[in-house]
Amino acid sequence: MNHTEAILKAQIVFEQPLTDKETIDQLLHIDAQMYANTGVETSKAEMESVKRASAFIYRLIKGIDYDKGQRLIQAMGLTR
């Protein structure tokens, strides 16, 4: 799964009538799939693309659960 597909899947999941926990679980599953599909032969550009998609997913999570989303974003080193 490339980052564009992941972002589209995340947007679709975000719009489904799921509980907050189910939505967050689905978004984190998409994020995990992206990282599972990377390896030592993944280029720097592809890795940066995956990181940007991850940040997008974490911002969606932040919209559902501020604290959880903020911790994920901080873990990526995107904020102080």
Question: What is the predicted role of each segment?
Answer:
Residues 1-80:
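Alpha-helical propensity feature that highlights long, continuous alpha-helices across diverse contexts
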